[in-house]
């Protein structure tokens, strides 16, 4: 992640176990305008204490799932990022 490049403020939404671990339903975070999905995942896991569910998280950028961790994500001011752990049920 290039810390010297431009940054934007992004809304982060937490669901289920991620909400419990982050201790909040939502937050705002400054992110670079461009970042790989893998770097983004590591940043969020570290910042919000999501290590216990790191390998099972699903990220969604503006309601579109991020399927490939090598994908480059382009953020604009006010974008939305959702952190969704797998849901269990029967």
UniProtKB/Swiss-Prot annotation:
Q: What is the protein name given in its UniProt record?
A: Molybdopterin synthase sulfur carrier subunit
What pairs make up the disulfide bonds? none
Q: Is the keyword Phosphoprotein in the record? A: yes
Localization, per the record, is: Cytoplasm
Question: GO MF annotations for this entry?
Answer: molybdopterin synthase activity; nucleotide binding
* PTM-bearing positions, type Glycyl adenylate: 90
| Gene Ontology cellular component list | cytosol; molybdopterin adenylyltransferase complex; molybdopterin synthase complex
| Lineage, opening ranks | Eukaryota, Metazoa, Ecdysozoa, Arthropoda, Hexapoda
InterPro entries per record: Beta-grasp_dom_sf (IPR012675), MOCS2A (IPR044672), MOCS2A_euk (IPR028887), Mopterin_synth/thiamin_S_b (IPR016155), ThiS/MoaD-like (IPR003749)
Oligomer and partners: Heterotetramer; composed of 2 small (Mocs2A) and 2 large (Mocs2B) subunits.
Q: Cite the entry's keywords alphabetically.
A: Cytoplasm, Molybdenum cofactor biosynthesis, Nucleotide-binding, Phosphoprotein
Which source organism does the UniProt entry give?
A: Drosophila yakuba (Fruit fly)
User: What else is noted?
Assistant: This protein is produced by a bicistronic gene which also produces the large subunit (Mocs2B).
| Modification(s) after translation | C-terminal thiocarboxylation occurs in 2 steps, it is first acyl-adenylated (-COAMP) via the hesA/moeB/thiF part of MOCS3, then thiocarboxylated (-COSH) via the rhodanese domain of MOCS3.
Question: Which residues, renumbered to this chain, carry the PTM 1-thioglycine?
Answer: 90
Role noted for this protein: Acts as a sulfur carrier required for molybdopterin biosynthesis. Component of the molybdopterin synthase complex that catalyzes the conversion of precursor Z into molybdopterin by mediating the incorporation of 2 sulfur atoms into precursor Z to generate a dithiolene group. In the complex, serves as sulfur donor by being thiocarboxylated (-COSH) at its C-terminus by MOCS3. After interaction with Mocs2B, the sulfur is then transferred to precursor Z to form molybdopterin.
Which pathway or pathways does this protein act in?
Cofactor biosynthesis; molybdopterin biosynthesis
**A GO biological-process term:** Mo-molybdopterin cofactor biosynthetic process
